[in-house]
Curated annotation (Swiss-Prot):
Family named by the database record: Belongs to the universal ribosomal protein uL6 family.
GO molecular function, one term: rRNA binding
Name under which the protein is recorded: Large ribosomal subunit protein uL6
Keyword Ribosomal protein: yes
Subunit and partners: Part of the 50S ribosomal subunit.
SUPFAM superfamilies reported for this sequence: Ribosomal protein L6
Gene3D superfamilies: Ribosomal protein L6, alpha-beta domain
Species of the source: Paenarthrobacter aurescens (strain TC1)
């Protein structure tokens, strides 16, 4: 039995879970998310707990068991608390500013780089070098934050670029001088 998959999921007050065949919908204070459960996995609801079960011990069923349980738990946490990734920009002249719901980055290129917010994602600019990406879908928040970081990855020699808050950059030693 999957150690993660066998744990029951408690549904907090104010969250409505709807099972419709293989589609599970979670509705909460922050919004609504839905997910299609893969075929061998079954989800059952008893009052305020959800249980994820698998019919057999095939490799595919075992791997989907823990995954499905975690995805449903992430959906419930997303509609109650939401998710947030903080990013910081390091480098002379590197900055970010909000243009409506979009962001405009100056990252040392010859042109400003614009990033528009996908549906369900909000950007909060906390200063010229700090921003946060927030939303209810954990995967989408992580993907948008990773795409922003990809615009200018941290340089291993000077550490300049876009990084996650608290991320430690492995530094390299430059070439030896005379």
């Amino acid at each position: 039995m999957s150690r993660i998959g066998r744990l029951p999921i408690t549904v907090p007050a104010g969250v409505e879970v709807k099972l419709d065949g293989s589609v599970i919908s979670v509705k909460g204070a922050k919004g609504e998310l839905s997910h299609t459960v893969a075929s061998p996995i079954e989800v059952t609801q008893e009052e305020n707990t959800l249980t994820v079960t698998r019919p057999n011990d095939e490799r595919n069923s075992r791997s989907l068991h823990g995954l499905t349980r975690t995805l449903i738990a992430n959906m419930i946490q997303g509609v109650t608390e939401g998710y947030e990734k903080k990013l910081e920009i390091v480098g002379t002249g590197y900055r970010v500013q909000a243009k409506g719901s979009d962001l405009e980055f100056a990252l040392g290129y010859s042109h400003p780089v614009n990033v528009s917010a996908p549906e369900g994602i909000t950007f909060v600019v906390e200063g010229p070098t700090k921003l946060s990406v927030a939303g209810i879908n954990k995967q989408q928040v992580g993907e948008v934050a990773a795409n922003i970081r990809k615009l200018r990855k941290p340089d291993p020699y000077k550490g300049k670029g876009v990084r996650y808050a608290g991320e430690v950059i492995r530094r390299k030693v430059g070439k030896a001088g005379k």
